[in-house]
Regions:
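The feature marks the mature, well-folded catalytic cores of soluble enzymes
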Residues: 1-178
Length: 178
């Protein structure tokens, strides 16, 4: 409003804006993704693969081994930049003797990064990354290869579900920058 040289919003208009911000309305949901969780996960995987992502469904104990195997199958270096994320710290990376991990933000020389995802969207096969101290956004953008760890429980039907989860985790007035 300031850039338009308009005064402060007042009266009913201000009340309407405040009410909408206090209780954001939920947008429309896509019917194809309103499924039981196992089918949501399958739909997410189908869409992700359609969009040329490589998907491997493994148990939590097998994540480090699968990451190492993926790198070997694709002739990628076993040196990875990893997000300093509590999600990723829960895995036994030390069991992978050939894997060299540097934790922190992405750098121009990084060829491979490993991060956790905030959510996966079943209706589109999209991963949602929430930037912050435990997930530097540079890890999403700089390396040529980005390995994303997504828990099945974090796959949601659609974008509207992600907005709700973001508000739950970060609060209404503090969202991740990216």
């Amino acid at each position: 409003r300031r850039s338009l040289r308009r005064g402060e919003l007042a009266g009913e208009a201000r009340s309407a804006v405040e009410a909408r911000l206090a209780s954001p309305p939920r947008g429309p949901s896509v019917a194809r993704a309103q499924l039981p969780q196992p089918e949501k996960v399958a739909l997410f995987c189908q869409w992700a693969e359609t969009l040329n992502a490589t998907v491997a469904r493994v148990g939590a104990d097998d994540v480090p081994g699968e990451v190492t195997a993926y790198l070997a199958r694709n002739n990628l270096p076993a040196n990875v930049a990893m997000a300093p994320s509590p999600l990723l710290e829960g895995y036994d990376w030390a069991s992978q003797k050939m894997l060299s991990i540097r934790r922190g933000r992405g750098e121009g020389s990084d060829q491979v990064s490993v991060t956790g995802a905030f959510a996966g969207i079943a209706e589109t096969g999209t991963v949602v990354m929430a930037s912050g101290p435990d997930h530097p956004v540079s890890l999403n953008l700089l390396p040529d290869t980005h390995v994303v760890v997504l828990r099945e429980a974090d796959v949601v039907a659609g974008y509207e579900d992600v907005w709700g989860r973001l508000r739950e985790r970060y609060g209404k007035n503090l969202m991740p920058r990216t």
